Amino acid sequence: KISFVKHKFNELNEIIIFFIFFLIIAVHIASKLNLGWDAKWFWYIKSLFYYQNQTINELSNYTFNDFHPHLGSYFWAFFRSLSINEYEYTGRLFYAFLYLISILIITSNIFKKKINNLILFSLLITITYRYDYFSGLQEVLIFSLLLVVSKLMYDLYEFKNTKNILFILLGLNSILWIKSEGIAYALIIFVVINFYPKIKIKSKIIFSIIFFLLIILKILIYKYYQIKINDQPYYLNYILNLDLNLIIYKIKNIFIFLTYNSLKNIIFFITGILIIFNFNQLKKINYNFLIFICFILNIIFIFCAYLFRDMEIIYSLKTTMDRIVFSSSGLYLLYILKFFTDRKKSKF
């Protein structure tokens, strides 16, 4: 009975801390009047379509930016319509809720003592929260979903719980419908899971078939509503005609901006340092090896995304690299936590 009461008391503390942070962030979001640039021109306008009872059919007429997925804008409109006053910012509170839930999920079982988990939960919010991410931009949704998926991937590796594959697929499908680059994150996770040594070939085949069916389904829906699959400035002719000087110039600046924003984000930077620190453990397929594959593919994606884009490189890096690094870091936060807690346990 004592242990039961203690367990319920800990759960109550968890709920109280969660809603205290949610209230603080909600007040902060409500006190800000500015939306992010992409939010003003893309995501908020799309949310208005849904808010005014329009559908994806009408949204396909928004030719200025019809190709970006619409799920984040739908959440914005849906939760706005559920609120009492239906102010614009109330829809964005769902972003904060998902963000807090995702951090709670990865911190709930790091330590045996619940109080330590709550301290860690509070610390991570303090480190990662910035209003800019909640100004209508979609990267916080990607970050949050990647946190949840990373937890599912860890449990799949550690405990061989193949039921997690279904939930991973649901997470990847959501990511596909939030931003265009969601396909890159989904493919990275797809490749990494197929490296898992403890999953049967049959399960991997089923996972792969369903994964590609989800991508095909998205393409078919876009075709049906006559929406461009992608309208980003990537052209085969431009890629084939890149000269060596421009390639070197772009790679140099990508490296500089990636390093700078990794230091600002710190999660991405620490991941790179830990992978180097654990390099001797990469000879066999273990959790460190899987994170290494994930991180390398992530770096390749970032470099390719900017290298082959027909846009002024400095402007492109200044306006987007910070958000790319932030959303990507959702893949690695749990890895960092596990690294330090496992080392602490090994000393005793």
Identify the meaning behind each predicted range.
Residues 32-46, 52-75, 86:
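Extracytoplasmic catalytic/substrate-binding loops of multi-pass membrane glycan-assembly enzymes
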Residues 8-9, 158-159, 185-211, 282-283:
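Perimembrane helix-loop-helix junctions
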Residues 131, 164-180, 186-191, 213:
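Membrane-interface alpha helices of multi-pass inner-membrane proteins
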Residues 66, 70-73, 82-101:
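Loop-to-helix entry region of an early transmembrane alpha helix in multi-pass inner-membrane enzymes
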Residues 99-111, 194-195, 264-292, 296, ...:
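Hydrophobic, aromatic-rich transmembrane alpha-helices
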